[in-house]
Amino acid sequence: MTAQIISGTELAKTIRAELADEVAKLKANGIEPGLAVILVGDDPASHSYVKGKQKACAEVGIRSLLYTFPATISEEELLAKIQELNADPTVHGILVQLPLPAHIREWSVIETIAPEKDVDGFHPINVGKMMIGQPAFLPCTPHGVLVMVKSAGIDIAGKHVVVVGRSNIVGKPVGQLFLREHATVTYAHSKTPDLAAITRQADILIVAVGKARLIGPEHVKPGAVVIDVGVNRLESGKLCGDVDFDAVKEVASYVTPVPGGVGPMTITMLLHNTMEAARQLAAK
């Protein structure tokens, strides 16, 4: 059995075409969705991610504004800029590219963004609303993962979902989203003994740790769905995920590739949240 590939690239194209139509409708009503992106320092990976986000915004007709600051900016100055953008009615979404320099507290930055403009879905208010099932901006990568699984026609209710990884950005929230869909959810992490014994129980295995090819065929139950969130650069310069794709695709029923899997969906969900923020702010 060779797994079916769930292509994030293809699914993202379809969703972005729908988003472009929605954005055009908003513009026809005099509302131009605007996303402000704040970039601190000169980390090459961060610059690359931001370029990708700007390009995607242009693709669907969202106005993107980039604010770049040196790594030496004080936390106070950065928070003042965020508060200025909170008050700007032409800005519907605010995104601060992570990671930040060590002297700036990440939580302080996230909590300063107005919850109604928190298109990353990281603000504690949005996280809390997600936990109790109230409408909220969902974090982009976990939401993208859920949409990918649903797009393949996979029934989630009653399935055992194992999440490897417990970050605030992916691991923790993705488990909660699948719990909301009536899955039984188990978390595994660096302190989990005998990882394979846990992951082999998964009907749906979601891996988000940032360790190249951590998951091999011995970790996967035959016929499982495997979602690879990790992005790692090998010494050769080639990108690979947390899953040994070539080996695991011979065991799984569905698998996501890296690149071309979860990545394009993360940015697509960011566009979705920005469009939704513009719609909600316009309705007020």
UniProtKB/Swiss-Prot annotation:
Signal peptide: none annotated. It holds the Pfam family THF_DHG_CYH_C. Keywords: Amino-acid biosynthesis, Histidine biosynthesis, Hydrolase, Methionine biosynthesis, Multifunctional enzyme, NADP, One-carbon metabolism, Oxidoreductase, Purine biosynthesis. InterPro entries: Aminoacid_DH-like_N_sf, NAD(P)-bd_dom_sf, THF_DH/CycHdrlase, THF_DH/CycHdrlase_cat_dom, THF_DH/CycHdrlase_CS, THF_DH/CycHdrlase_NAD-bd_dom. It comes from the Bacteria. PANTHER family: C-1-TETRAHYDROFOLATE SYNTHASE, CYTOPLASMIC, C-1-TETRAHYDROFOLATE SYNTHASE, CYTOPLASMIC-RELATED. GO terms for cellular component: cytosol. It catalyses: (6R)-5,10-methylene-5,6,7,8-tetrahydrofolate + NADP(+) = (6R)-5,10-methenyltetrahydrofolate + NADPH; (6R)-5,10-methenyltetrahydrofolate + H2O = (6R)-10-formyltetrahydrofolate + H(+). It comes from Geobacillus thermodenitrificans (strain NG80-2). Catalyzes the oxidation of 5,10-methylenetetrahydrofolate to 5,10-methenyltetrahydrofolate and then the hydrolysis of 5,10-methenyltetrahydrofolate to 10-formyltetrahydrofolate. Its EC number is 1.5.1.5, 3.5.4.9. Pathway: One-carbon metabolism; tetrahydrofolate interconversion. One of its GO terms (biological process) is purine nucleotide biosynthetic process. This is Bifunctional protein FolD. Belongs to the tetrahydrofolate dehydrogenase/cyclohydrolase family. PROSITE patterns: THF_DHG_CYH_1, THF_DHG_CYH_2.
